[in-house]
């Protein structure tokens, strides 16, 4: 009688389930959709601040991409007119630097703030859903596994939400910078990016290796968390049966399996990341060699050569970030599937 009364009171006190309820901030209920599309309702709830964030990032990118062109013009004017004409460009470059700093600071601040807020929304969503699941769910799923999904898995998604847009903006800068390079000198621009298709091939191979290892690593992190949580919760039982040595052995085996998968993941990154980051830097050697020869021959000016050097540094940024973002994408994909396994459980308390 008392237990039934408490159950009725508990159900009455709980708010309606927000996970799949229409109009609520939750995940998409269609399990056949791509994992990113299932998270769209959470992203849509922050669409205003996200739009402001991307607007600041794009405007700051336009300013940044325009700097080498202004610098090119300033150097050419200074070489043609040594007596003057340079001070105006100095003030323009100073103003562009201040504007780029302010816009990029605002963009990064708002982006990370939005990512953390979405992480908070997802944590709250999982917490409210866990309070509505039947006891049979906790009989099937270990407590350490639940803790891992509610912490490290959500953290993986938050990191992708923070660094994914950063990489997208860097990729946009590559497109814009390459377009400006083509407008200056087509053969030199094509020679500079000749090695980029190889970077794409390496990135695809890295993705194929990283995803299964990320999935296994996340699961084994949950296994270690489960062993630790069970021993903390059942300390008295372990001591009563003098099972300390047995539990230490269980933890050692779980940690060994985690070490193997984590080491394999690092090894996969180490085989591909150096090449992915180094190949774009060969473009600088092409600019110095081929571009220097063109400058000596009088086909391009010194300002053009400096602008190309600046653009080469700019277009190498997305490739330096590519390995990290690919790893975070694979980890977030694996983590989202583990989180959806909880959120897709039918609650008994409505």
Regions found by a protein language model. Give the residues of each.
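Membrane-proximal cytosolic tails and large cytosolic loops of membrane proteins
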Residues: 1-32
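Transmembrane helix-loop-helix hairpins at lipid-water interfaces of multipass membrane proteins
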Residues: 3-6, 10, 50-103, 182-187, ...
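Juxtamembrane helix-loop junctions of ABC transporter transmembrane domains
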Residues: 21-32, 55, 63-79, 96-143, ...
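A short amphipathic helical element positioned immediately N-terminal to and/or at the very start
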Residues: 30-50, 145-146, 150
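Alpha-helical segments in transporter systems
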Residues: 37-40, 48-69, 73, 89, ...
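An intracellular "coupling" helix at the cytosolic face of ABC transporter transmembrane type-1 domains
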Residues: 44-48, 135-136, 152-161, 209-226, ...
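Transmembrane helices of ABC transporter permease
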Residues: 45, 49-62, 166-217, 289-300
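Helix-loop-helix
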Residues: 81-85, 180-194, 268-337, 342-343
